[in-house]
Amino acid sequence: MVQIIDGKALAQKMQAALAKKVESLKAEKGIVPGLVVILVGDNPASQVYVRNKERAALAAGFKSETVRLSDSVCQEELIELIEQYNQDDTIHGILVQLPLPHHINDKSIILAIDPKKDVDGFHPMNTGHLWSGRPNMVPCTPAGIMEMFHDYGIELEGKNAVIVGRSNIVGKPMAQLLLDKNATVTLTHSRTRQLAAICRRADILIVAIGQGHFITKDFVKEGAVVIDVGMNRDVNGRLIGDVAFDEVSELASMITPVPGGVGPMTITMLLEQTYQAALRRVSQ
């Protein structure tokens, strides 16, 4: 019988504990962790993500700001806004919601964020810390998945872990975090040959490609742990993952659902890293 990895329940537990830590920080040091989310344009999915982040931040006792900009905003204006928040001592975390309009260079925007406030973990300084085995700010989705492994007692050392998708947001940082735990990692992508055969060797299979129900039972060995990062809409508008949940559940020992799996943990780690940034500010 497959065990469902309930990311929603774990996120609720962690956010409740975080709210208590925030309350203590405010009482003892007079500091409230501050998070600003900058949204450019009117991408419907991004709007949903931003609302969820704002709601969770306020519920945990954070100072939360959301800046909504027209998709016609120029890159220089956006960088100027980021610089203002870099200098704002009441803001400990800055997140620019991706994707950005085509006329704005993502890399330039990420570089503009103070690495100490880069709670998405995308700044080259933070990726350098991650790849040198000294993680500081870590991309939130991989960080959330690692918390799931810990909470559910999933052993990583010596296990074969296969990641489908090599993005800077999930695939690459996920690979490094697993290597740090002594897993044997294979990072696959759209040019990988015999993908199904490689996936069938996985004790732990992590999928982040943005293609609904791409991973079927033909990709999964019996007893594997399957982590589905995908968020897609089917023809009826229903939210589905990259993994064909029903058929893969027949083989997997543990699996994350969509929705209610990885997504809530991503937001939780965003808040946790903002809190940690506020703590570091106190100790300076």
From Swiss-Prot:
Catalyzes the oxidation of 5,10-methylenetetrahydrofolate to 5,10-methenyltetrahydrofolate and then the hydrolysis of 5,10-methenyltetrahydrofolate to 10-formyltetrahydrofolate. NADP(+) binds at residues 165-167, 190. Its EC number is 1.5.1.5, 3.5.4.9. The gene is folD. Pathway: One-carbon metabolism; tetrahydrofolate interconversion. This is Bifunctional protein FolD. It comes from Streptococcus equi subsp. zooepidemicus (strain H70). It holds the Pfam family THF_DHG_CYH_C. Belongs to the tetrahydrofolate dehydrogenase/cyclohydrolase family. It catalyses: (6R)-5,10-methylene-5,6,7,8-tetrahydrofolate + NADP(+) = (6R)-5,10-methenyltetrahydrofolate + NADPH; (6R)-5,10-methenyltetrahydrofolate + H2O = (6R)-10-formyltetrahydrofolate + H(+). One of its GO terms (molecular function) is methylenetetrahydrofolate dehydrogenase (NADP+) activity. Keywords: Amino-acid biosynthesis, Histidine biosynthesis, Hydrolase, Methionine biosynthesis, Multifunctional enzyme, NADP, One-carbon metabolism, Oxidoreductase, Purine biosynthesis. Transmembrane segments: none annotated. InterPro entries: Aminoacid_DH-like_N_sf, NAD(P)-bd_dom_sf, THF_DH/CycHdrlase, THF_DH/CycHdrlase_cat_dom, THF_DH/CycHdrlase_CS, THF_DH/CycHdrlase_NAD-bd_dom. GO terms for cellular component: cytosol. Signal peptide: none annotated. One of its GO terms (biological process) is tetrahydrofolate interconversion. The lineage of its organism: Bacteria, Bacillati, Bacillota, Bacilli, Lactobacillales. Homodimer.
